[in-house]
């Protein structure tokens, strides 16, 4: 969707031009540019420390050249903790399947020493900085993800999240409604 201009009148009859859809603005206007990243060499303990310290749900993973090579989210970590690994025992043709009974604490302990790339999403989903907000919303919605890196000429310049898009959309809507009420 691209910009569609149309005339709108305010209460005093003054004509002004506006966009038909406020989500046509570029994501660069609302994305977060103070991006926290982790190295592809990081352990999950280091990742969790960054997630907690900066109260974020996901982080781009960069290599030594600062190129984005993956993304790790709290969802990836929760999947690891929640999974139950089957343990198959074959006793002379009697096959038994038991599921591990590792406690949450044990799984968390096992998690801490893993390299981030063992759990990370390496099929990188990203948007370009010149995407319209509605295009970014479509990517996040179709891929069912909460946030993704924003790249410009292959370099990380920000992150965009569903919550930022929704905050912007609601704010724009409320401002427009308030202007109509004046």
Feature locations, PLM:
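Tandem CBS (Cystathionine beta-synthase) repeat/Bateman regulatory domains
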Residues: 1-182
């Amino acid at each position: 969707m691209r910009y569609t201009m149309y005339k709108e009148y305010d209460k005093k009859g003054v004509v002004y031009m506006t966009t038909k859809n406020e989500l046509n603005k570029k994501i660069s206007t609302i994305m977060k540019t103070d991006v926290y990243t982790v190295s592809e060499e990081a352990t999950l303990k280091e990742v969790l420390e960054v997630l907690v310290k900066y109260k974020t749900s996901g982080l781009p993973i960069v290599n030594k050249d600062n190129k984005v090579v993956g993304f790790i989210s709290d969802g990836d970590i929760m999947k690891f903790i929640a999974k139950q690994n089957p343990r198959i025992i074959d006793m002379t043709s009697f096959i038994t399947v038991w599921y591990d009974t590792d406690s949450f604490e044990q799984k968390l302990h096992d998690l801490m020493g893993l390299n981030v790339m063992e759990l990370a999403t390496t099929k990188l989903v990203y948007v370009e900085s010149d995407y319209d907000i509605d295009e970014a919303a479509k990517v996040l919605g179709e891929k069912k993800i909460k946030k993704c890196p924003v790249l410009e000429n292959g370099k990380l310049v920000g992150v965009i999240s569903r919550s930022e898009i929704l905050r912007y959309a609601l704010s724009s809507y409320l401002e427009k409604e308030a202007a109509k009420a004046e």
